[in-house]
Amino acid sequence: MLEFEQGFNHLATLKVIGVGGGGNNAVNRMIDHGMNNVEFIAINTDGQALNLSKAESKIQIGEKLTRGLGAGANPEIGKKAAEESREQIEDAIQGADMVFVTAGMGGGTGTGAAPVVAKIAKEMGALTVGVVTRPFGFEGRKRQTQAAAGVESMKAAVDTLIVIPNDRLLDIVDKSTPMMEAFKEADNVLRQGVQGISDLIAVSGEVNLDFADVKTIMSNQGSALMGIGVSSGENRAVEAAKKAISSPLLETSIVGAQGVLMNITGGESLSLFEAQEAADIVQDAADEDVNMIFGTVINPELQDEIVVTVIATGFEDKPSSQGRKATSTGFGSSVNSSSNHQSGASAKEDSFSAHTSHSQSSESVSERSHTTKDDDIPSFIRNREERRSRRTRR
């Protein structure tokens, strides 16, 4: 079912909360990148680390419990610290329509406090999305075990959860890539997610989308796949749609999604046929009875480029079996497995915004991997062609 939403676009209030060292670092890098219409909040037990935060709002939690000295890699301390400072957290969240809670799982403050913060946000009526990372395999079994428990706690607290296994970073960066540059790739998952949704609800379109549409697709769904794809030239609509639903950081496939919010932004040359082409790619990959809400925006600044933003939910939580070989710009997917599945994709994510230049060089997969012709075709595309072939034979 394809629904077209038209009407007035209400600008919702978005807040991004970084919890613990990893979350605070992610927020700092987002602020450095520059984002509008978003409020940033940093939460930590470590007073010294909190002083380094660039967020406009800073909350030192558990001052009585930890005396500003951190949680000592103990999630239980992080949890109790957040519970001690509940009123301060509530005051900071007040007025938010949507809250992103980001943290690194495996340590003390992020693992223990982030689920408490997320639960408070959801109880206050905000659409709550968790974006967390799993530790690298070399960080040890104890940290992995604590991270798995933290992910489970986050799942129970948020509307949707996006998990980024840090081990995936090893698949999308070169051996010579500096560590801080590699971590920026993980931060892009959060940044592009916030930017994509902010653009969806802040920019009026020919076929309009607003925060109510985002909430319809993401509320109480447990799992979410979100992505942005950009392309230009011949077959730009198809290529942008493929990129939006494929990412080297994804562990969950769009296959079987029952709810999809899709927006296409293009220049004045964007045609109805191109919009249909892009929608077909996404719709055919999702469940056959998908509830698809579709919007379009004309932005003359884009000229020959097309930007496709996709939010998909309501699919079974299982790791994707397809090896993603296409260059992609998707910015994250929720997972419900503690195991780290190695991705076959090797292209770096690009950073895209509907208001800025979208070109960023990336090494093509054809230069970095050797595949057969069939392997170059995503499995959902092959499945679509097989379904059409069977219908024709009938």
Curated annotation (Swiss-Prot):
UniProt keyword annotations, A-Z: Cell cycle, Cell division, Cytoplasm, GTP-binding, Nucleotide-binding, Septation
Source domain of life is: Bacteria
Q: Where is the composition biased (Low complexity)?
A: 328-346, 353-364
Q: Which GO terms describe its cellular component?
A: cell division site; cytoplasm
Q: Does the keyword Coiled coil apply?
A: no
What are the boundaries of the region Disordered? 317-394
The record's principal subcellular location, in a coarse class, is cytoplasm
Basic and acidic residues bias: start-end ranges: 365-388
For biological process, the GO terms are:
division septum assembly; FtsZ-dependent cytokinesis; protein polymerization
Keyword Hydrolase present in the record's keywords: the answer is no
MF annotations from Gene Ontology? GTP binding; GTPase activity
Membrane-spanning residues where?
Answer: none
Annotated family: Belongs to the FtsZ family.
Functional note: Essential cell division protein that forms a contractile ring structure (Z ring) at the future cell division site. The regulation of the ring assembly controls the timing and the location of cell division. One of the functions of the FtsZ ring is to recruit other cell division proteins to the septum to produce a new cell wall between the dividing cells. Binds GTP and shows GTPase activity.
Q: What is this protein called?
A: Cell division protein FtsZ
Task: Give the species.
Answer: Staphylococcus epidermidis (strain ATCC 35984 / DSM 28319 / BCRC 17069 / CCUG 31568 / BM 3577 / RP62A)
Q: Which gene encodes it?
A: ftsZ
